[in-house]
Amino acid sequence: MEFKYSTLIDPEMYETEGLCDGIPVRYHNNPELEEIDCLRCHEHWRENVGPLGVYKGGLADQWNGISIAIPEALPDRLGVVSYASEFAFVHDDVIDIAQHGNEQNDDLRVGFEQMIDAGAIKYSTSGKRALQSYIAKRMLSIDRERAIISLRAWLEFIEKTGRQEERRFNNEKEFLKYRIYDVGMLFWYGLLTFAQKITIPENELTTCHELAIPAYRHMALLNDLVSWEKERASSIALGKDYCINFIFVAMEESGISEDEAKERCREEIKLATVDYLRVFDEAKDRIDLSHDTMLYLESLLYSMSGNVVWGLQSPRYYTDAKFSQRQLDWIKNGLPLEVRLEDRVFGLSPSEDRVTHQAVIENGLPESGLGKNGNSSNGVDVNKALLSAVLHEHLKGHAVFKMSDHEVKVKASNGRSLDTKVLQAPYEYITGLPSKRLREQAIDAMNVWFRVPAEKLDLIKSITTILHNASLMLDDVEDGSELRRGNPSTHTIFGLSQTINSANYQLVRALERVQKLEDSESLLVFTEELRNLYIGQSMDLYWTGNLICPTMNEYFHMVECKTGGLFRLFTRLMSLHSTSAVKVDPTTLSTRLGIYFQTRDDYKNLVSTEYTKQKGYCEDLEEGKFSLPLIHLIQAMPDNHVLRNILTQWRVTRKVTLAQKQVVLGLMEKSGSLKFTRETLASLYSGLEKSFTELEEKFGTENFQLKLILQFLRTE
C-alpha cells in the first residue's frame, strides 16, 4: 500500500496490551477533519432529534477513532465518514437504552431504503432522517457509485442484526457468528471502501468477506472487552438479566468469573490477530485477487490495530479518559466558522445527480467551519489550506442543502429572535457526562406498579432529569468541586455566572413540563419538594461554611430534604397520574431510598477507587462537608487535637492535603467510623427492603426491575 495521508506511529506513544502484536499503527495527518464532523453530527442531533450533551463517540484526547482506524482515508472523505460513524455510535446508544430497539432500527432502515429506492428521504418525526439525508447527500456528492454501495451495505447490516436484540446465545461460537455482523462488518466495509476509494469486483466479494472474518472477529471481541462495563450498565437499566457481550456469554457457558471471562476474551483477540496475519500473508501470494481487494484486506490490518489503540483510551468506554484541548475548546465555544465562501454551504449533490440519487428533505442547517485566517474564534490552529481545497473541490455547482434549526426561539422586544443555545450549553454539557441514570431507571421500575401513561411518564422523567442535573451544576459551584463524573465540572468550563444562570433557567423548563401534566396537585408536589431540596442544601452549606458539626438526627433530616426530595418528587407525581386501581402512598420508600443513596455516597466518597476517578480522592473532606463518617468521628473523638486542627486549617485555606486526608481516614478506621457507616447502611437497606416488600404486597405485583436496582445499589 502506498501511504499518502498518514504517519507511522512510534510504538512508545501508544498502548496495545499485546492485543495486536505484529501490526503497525498509523494515524491520519489531518484528524481535525474528523473532529469537526463528529461535533457537527452532535449539533445536528440536538437540533433535529433531541438533547445529547457532550457526547462521547469517536473522539479522544490523543487518537480519534476514524483517523486511526482508517488512516489512509482520502481527506475529502474523512469528514463525512467520521460523521456517519458518529451517527452510528449515537444510534447504537439509543438502541442500547431503548425499550423498543427494533422500532429505532426500523426507522433507520426505512430511511436508507427510501434513499436507495426513490432517491429521497422523507421526513420522520424522529428527526434522524434529516441526519441520514445529510450523510447520503454528502457522500453522493463526492462519489455516487461508492456512496450507493456503502449505503446498501449499511442497510444490509441493519436488516441482518436489527431483529436479534432480545436473543440469548447458548455458546461462544454461535455468539461470535452473530457478533461479527453486529459489530458492523458490512457497515465498516461500506465506510472503508468509500473512505479509501476502493471497489471490490463483484466476483471477489464473497471471497473478500470470507478472508476478512478473522479481522472482524478481532474487532468484535475488542469492542466487547472495552465496552463491557457500558453494556452491562445498559442491560441493568433495561431490567435485563443478560448482556449481548462475549464476556457475559463466556461466563454463562463456562461458569467462569468475570475476570476469567475477560482474560478469555483477550486470548481470543490475540488468536484472531495471528489468524488474520496468516490469512493476509497467504492472500499476498494469490493471483486471483485484484489490487483493490488486497488494498481492502491490508487496510483491515490498520483498522484492527487502530481499533485497539483507540478502544483502550476512548472516553466512550472509560470515564477517566479525556478529550483533547482543541476538542474541549470547540465543545465550549462552538465549531470554527468555515472558510467564508460566497454561498456558505457545504458539500452538496451536483445538480445533474438530483434526478436519480438526491437525498431530499425540506429542512436545512447552517454549516460551521473556519474563520478568515484558518483559526477558530478561540485561536485553535486548523489546516486551512487542506480544508479550503476540500471545500472548493466539492462546492462547484452544488445546490443549497440545509436541515431545519429546531432551537427554541424567543422574540425580543425589537422583534428579533433570540435562541437558547448559549443558555442551554452548560446544561447540555452536564447531561452528556457519563451517568448510570439511576432516577430514570427507578421511574421505569416504579411504573411496573403505577402504570402511568407513556406521555405523562416521559414528562415526569424529564422534570426529574432537569432538576437533578440543575442541582448538580449548582452543587458543584457551591462546593467548589472541580470534577463531575470524571470530567471537569460545568463551572470550570463555562464559568460561575453562565453556569448559575443556566441552572436557574432549568427550573423554568421543569415548570413548563409540570404545567403539561395539567393539574394543580402536580404543581403543589413540585413546589413542595423543590422547597425541601433548597432547604436541605441550605443546611448543608451552613454547616460547612460555619464549621458546625450537626447531630446525627440533623444530618438525616437534611438528607431527607435534599436527596430524598427528588425521589419523592417523581414517585408522588407517578402516584398522582397512576392508572392502577391500587392507590398507595410511595413516600416512605422514596424517602428511604434517598437517605440510603446519600449515606452510601458518603461512604463511597471515602473508600471507592471508582469514586476517586469520578470526583477525586476523599472529595467530601476536600469540600469540608460533614458526612456521616465524619460526624461519627467527631462525636467519637471530640478532644482529638489533630482532627480539630485539620478542620480548622480547612476553614483558613479551604484545602485538605493528601497527607491530611490520609490522617483523617486513619482516625476513622481507628474510631470505628467506617464500620459504623457500613452498619448504618446495612440497617438502612433493611428498611428499604421492608418498604419495597410492603409495596409489592399492596400492589399484588412482583417488581423484579426495582429489586435489581436495589441489589445493584447494595453490591456495587
Curated annotation (Swiss-Prot):
Binding residues annotated for Mg(2+) 4, in chain numbering: 475, 479
Chain positions recorded as Mg(2+) 2 binding sites: 92
Biological processes annotated in GO: alcohol biosynthetic process; mycotoxin biosynthetic process; terpenoid biosynthetic process
PROSITE patterns, per database record: POLYPRENYL_SYNTHASE_1 (PS00723)
Stretch list, region Terpene cyclase: 1-323
Pfam families per record: polyprenyl_synt, Terpene_syn_C_2
Pathway: Secondary metabolite biosynthesis; terpenoid biosynthesis
Annotated positions binding isopentenyl diphosphate: 436, 439, 468, 485
Catalyzed chemical reaction(s): isopentenyl diphosphate + (2E,6E)-farnesyl diphosphate = (2E,6E,10E)-geranylgeranyl diphosphate + diphosphate; isopentenyl diphosphate + (2E,6E,10E)-geranylgeranyl diphosphate = (2E,6E,10E,14E)-geranylfarnesyl diphosphate + diphosphate; (2E,6E,10E,14E)-geranylfarnesyl diphosphate = astellifadiene + diphosphate
Binding site for dimethylallyl diphosphate: 484, 562-563, 598, 605, 615, 625
Binding site residues for Mg(2+) 1: 92
UniProt motif DDXXD 2: location: 475-479
Location of the motif DDXXD 1: 92-96
Residues that bind Mg(2+) 3: 475, 479
Motif (NSE/DTE): 223-231
Single GO MF annotation: prenyltransferase activity
Keywords of this entry: Isoprene biosynthesis, Lyase, Magnesium, Metal-binding, Multifunctional enzyme, Repeat, Transferase
Known EC number: 4.2.3.-, 2.5.1.29, 2.5.1.81
Cofactor: Mg(2+)
Function in brief: Bifunctional terpene synthase that converts dimethylallyl diphosphate (DMAPP) and isopentenyl diphosphate (IPP) into astellifadiene. The C-terminal prenyltransferase (PT) domain of EvAS catalyzes formation of geranylfarnesyl pyrophosphate (GFPP), whereas the N-terminal terpene cyclase (TC) domain catalyzes the cyclization of GFPP to astellifadiene.
Family stated for the protein in its record: In the N-terminal section; belongs to the terpene synthase family.
Comment block on domains: The conserved DDXXD motifs as well as the NSE/DTE motif are important for the catalytic activity, presumably through binding to Mg(2+).
Subunit structure: Hexamer.
Name this polypeptide is given: Astellifadiene synthase
Origin species: Emericella variicolor
Gene responsible for this protein: EvAS
